[in-house]
């Protein structure tokens, strides 16, 4: 079973749309222990500096990137389960994305889809997928095949 308390999300920018915030809050209630750290929009270099100050060396860093690796929900659940409860930090860039040097620091880069999403929706999708991965590993009824 996934231990969500080992996961953290660092996200650039605020959620401005109420319906997205409501969706995020719904899934966060189902994922107690998941930490979400919001960073103020700034230049990419300032955002990178702030992110580097937050992450520690023992964290497994995953950046969300349109060129990252794509998974099915079951594959993502398996990959997370096989991480052996490492401290995993997911980083979602703002409107301008993340710097290439920050992406290069990542242990792996994740693509949620070949489509491009606003960062607010990417945050909702990632949190939903973490919830889905948790239910897949628990054998719960949420994920349908």
Swiss-Prot record:
Chief location bin = cytoplasm
Name of the top EC class for this enzyme:
transferase
Q: What does this protein do?
A: Specifically methylates the pseudouridine at position 1915 (m3Psi1915) in 23S rRNA.
Q: Which reaction equation describes what this protein catalyses? A: pseudouridine(1915) in 23S rRNA + S-adenosyl-L-methionine = N(3)-methylpseudouridine(1915) in 23S rRNA + S-adenosyl-L-homocysteine + H(+)
Keywords of this protein's UniProt record, alphabetized?
Answer: Cytoplasm, Methyltransferase, rRNA processing, S-adenosyl-L-methionine, Transferase
Q: What GO terms are given for molecular function?
A: rRNA (pseudouridine-N3-)-methyltransferase activity
Assembly and partners are described as:
Homodimer.
What is the protein name stated in its UniProt record? Ribosomal RNA large subunit methyltransferase H
Q: Which organism is the protein's source?
A: Prochlorococcus marinus (strain NATL1A)
Protein localization? Cytoplasm
Q: Which GO terms describe its cellular component?
A: cytoplasm
């Amino acid at each position: 079973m996934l231990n969500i308390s080992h996961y953290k999300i660092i996200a650039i920018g605020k959620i401005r749309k109420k319906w997205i915030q409501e969706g995020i809050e719904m899934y966060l209630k189902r994922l107690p222990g998941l930490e979400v750290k919001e960073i103020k929009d700034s230049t990419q270099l300032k955002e990178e500096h702030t992110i580097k100050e937050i992450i520690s060396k023992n964290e497994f860093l995953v950046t969300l990137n349109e060129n990252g690796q794509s998974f099915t929900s079951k594959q993502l659940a398996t990959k997370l389960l096989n991480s052996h409860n490492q401290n995993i930090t997911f980083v979602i860039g703002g409107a301008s994305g993340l710097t290439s040097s920050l992406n290069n620091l990542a242990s792996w880069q994740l693509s949620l889809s070949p489509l491009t999403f606003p960062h607010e929706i990417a945050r909702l999708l990632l949190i939903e997928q973490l919830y889905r991965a948790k239910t897949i590993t628990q054998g719960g009824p949420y994920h349908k095949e």
